[in-house]
Amino acid sequence: MQVLDDIEFDEKLRIRKVVEGWLWNENLLYDVFSSHILTANRIMGCSFRTGQGRIEYNAKFTRRHDDKQLAELLKIEVMRIILKHPYTRRQEGIRDDASVCASDVTIVQNCRIGDVGSNEIMTAETFNIPKGYCYEEYCKILTQLFSTLPPSESV
């Protein structure tokens, strides 16, 4: 069993409050979230990450967001599970960072997402690329774009 510090415990309660609201308003998000285990991860460099039946959160990042922003970031992460990207739909030859950014771009332009208050979530405007492509096409576009950047400028 994972031992949480006070900040991690408080953030877990905030996340649970968001999810409880989904029970009445966003049944699909609630059901998908409920099929995963919520776990604190102190090492990762973002608010949320999913994989292997878990939704991980880093309290150092989640606490920077107000409740509405936290809800939007969590919604994006659950949408990744529903859409099976970036992990399950990863294509051969696609960079990891490009697939994560392509997931952001696709979700933000196709789902109703409010302000997340940070630069954690990338948009087509972030990279000055056209809108309207599917996830797989954005993976290719961003892999090509990132391969032209020096390592210090890569995402």
Residue ranges of model-derived segments:
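Short, functionally important secondary-structure microenvironments
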Residues: 1-72, 77-155
